[in-house]
Regions:
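ATP/Mg2+ or Mg2+-diphosphate-binding catalytic cores
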Residues: 298-340
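Active-site acidic catalytic loop and adjacent metal/ATP-binding pocket
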Residues: 20-23, 62, 178-246
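ATP-dependent phospho-/nucleotidyl transfer catalytic cores
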Residues: 12, 32, 122-214, 268
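A glycine-centered beta->alpha junction motif in the catalytic cores
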Residues: 80-93, 144-153, 251, 293-311
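ATP-binding pocket architecture of kinase catalytic cores
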Residues: 27-124
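Active-site activation/catalytic loop segments of kinase-like enzymes and analogous catalytic loops
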Residues: 245-278, 291-310
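ATP-binding glycine-rich phosphate-binding loop
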Residues: 2-24
């Protein structure tokens, strides 16, 4: 009954992951339940329709129903959305060429998103998210909270002993990253922000208004699909105003962890991005401070604190040990990144 609300001929339907993949006379579409707001949907649609997808970049745009609405209601009252569907496989993060290609397409996406001016009606929580420095500040507090809890415990588990052994080292990195990030975004021009001469008029206006640029917001290899002659970057439900370097960081970090912090690969990914969209000094510093912050370490501590502390799976202890083992390679990459 929901499918009947769309102006297209249905050829076949098959169940996907929590959705229906529909073959129609207008190409492949994806129908899925939606629990968000119409306002959020309209925001995403307004942005995606402005992107030029005639070349090597594709996005999963929404399809409006016969009434011109983005949301379609089923008989039971549940809401559904339809969007373009790409059957292509995910970016293989073990393939250096494919990684670099995916990252160059991300730069292409970012370049287009930078041309889109924020609108007054976009002022909602899901778009104006927590800033990078506030997020790091919260993570530092959470690390301390977990360490203080463990320190007060008797009869520590292997995981807890591992935390006590490594905490000071990683906490120092977290503090340094936070302090530098705060300086970077601080209001005091001489110590924190780049000199006005280094910024364009548009960048200065955005800086004064505390606005960032549109970012994907949840980027990993699962959202980068490699098609024949194009790359589809999908799932914009976490798109927000912020620092675009965060998208690059998320994808790069996933790759670097898989490749044992291979410095040559890391720098080549950065080159692939900057050939399409060069970053300014502030963005590069921001990227460096994101990498300096021990996010994987914080994740393990936060997982521990928020779950059953009496039993921590062995794989979590192994993850902490792996972080320690990979640290020399990670530090070498950080040194190279800082010099870029």
């Amino acid at each position: 009954e929901v499918l009947e609300q769309y102006e297209m001929e249905l050829l076949s339907v098959r169940k996907g992951r929590g959705a229906w993949i529909c073959e129609t006379d207008k190409g492949l579409k994806l129908l899925q339940e939606y629990r968000g707001t119409v306002r959020r949907l309209e925001f995403e649609d307004q942005v995606l329709e402005k992107l030029d997808t005639r070349g090597s970049l594709r996005v999963d745009r929404y399809v409006r129903n016969r009434e011109g609405a983005l949301l379609s209601k089923a008989g039971d009252g549940s809401n559904y959305i339809m969007k373009e569907y790409f059957p292509d496989r995910e970016c293989n993060i073990r393939d250096h060429y494919e990684i670099r290609l995916g990252i160059s397409r991300l730069a292409m996406l970012h370049g287009q998103l930078r041309q889109i001016q924020p609108k007054e009606e976009w002022n909602m929580g899901s778009i104006c998210v927590e800033s990078l420095e506030k997020e790091q500040e919260r993570h530092v507090r959470e690390m301390k909270r977990a360490r203080n809890f463990i320190r007060g415990k008797r009869g520590k588990t292997e995981f807890e002993l591992c935390v006590m052994d490594t905490f000071d080292y990683f906490f120092q990195q977290a503090k340094e990253a936070l302090d530098q990030m705060n300086n970077l975004f601080s209001e005091s021009k001489p110590s924190g922000q780049l000199a006005a001469a280094e910024l364009s008029t548009e960048d200065l206006e955005r800086q004064e208004n505390s606005l960032g640029y549109l970012c994907h917001g949840d980027l990993d290899q699962h959202h980068v699909l490699m098609g024949n002659g194009y790359t589809a970057i999908i799932e914009y439900n976490r798109m927000h105003l912020g620092v675009q370097a965060e998208d690059l960081y998320r994808l790069m970090r996933k790759v670097m962890e898989k490749h044992g912090w291979d410095g040559d690969l890391g720098i080549s990914m950065l080159d692939s991005y900057e050939r399409v969209r060069p970053m300014d000094k502030k963005e590069r510093k921001c990227l460096y401070y994101m990498f300096l912050f021990p996010e994987k370490y914080w994740k393990q501590l936060n997982f521990y604190y928020n779950t059953n502390k009496a039993w921590i799976p062995a794989k979590n202890t192994d993850k902490l040990k792996n972080l320690k083992n990979q640290e020399n390679a990670r530090r070498r990459f950080l040194e190279r990144l800082e010099k870029e």
